[in-house]
C-alpha cells in the first residue's frame, strides 16, 4: 500500500523499498511503499469512492497536478487501474 502525502514528496524518490510516512493531519505513522517500488510494480490500483473525492480524482487522473504524489505514479512496465464509483468519477 501507499501513504505518500504532499508534505513528504521525498518518499517518491527514496532508494528504499518502504519508508515511514506521517499523516499530515492526524500524525499517524504508516508504512508506505516508495515511488521507486510503485513505479516498478506490474499493477497499481487506485480506489476512490464518494463525491468528496471527485475533485481529487480529477486533479490526479485528468490534470496530473504535480503537487499530488499520486500524479507521479506511472508504472514503467506495468498497468495503472482506477476503480471509482460514479460519485468520485463525476468530474472526469
What residues fall within each predicted segment?
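Conserved phosphate- and dinucleotide-binding cores of soluble alpha/beta proteins
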Residues: 1-92
Amino acid at each position: 500500500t501507499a501513504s505518500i502525502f504532499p508534505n513528504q514528496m521525498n518518499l517518491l524518490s527514496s532508494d528504499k523499498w518502504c519508508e515511514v510516512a506521517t499523516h499530515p493531519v492526524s500524525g499517524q505513522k504508516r508504512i508506505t511503499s516508495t515511488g521507486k517500488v510503485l513505479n516498478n510494480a506490474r499493477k497499481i490500483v487506485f480506489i476512490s469512492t464518494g463525491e468528496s473525492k471527485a475533485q481529487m480524482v480529477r486533479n490526479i487522473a485528468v490534470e496530473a497536478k504535480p503537487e499530488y504524489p499520486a500524479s507521479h505514479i506511472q508504472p514503467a512496465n506495468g498497468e495503472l487501474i482506477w476503480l471509482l464509483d460514479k460519485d468520485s468519477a463525476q468530474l472526469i
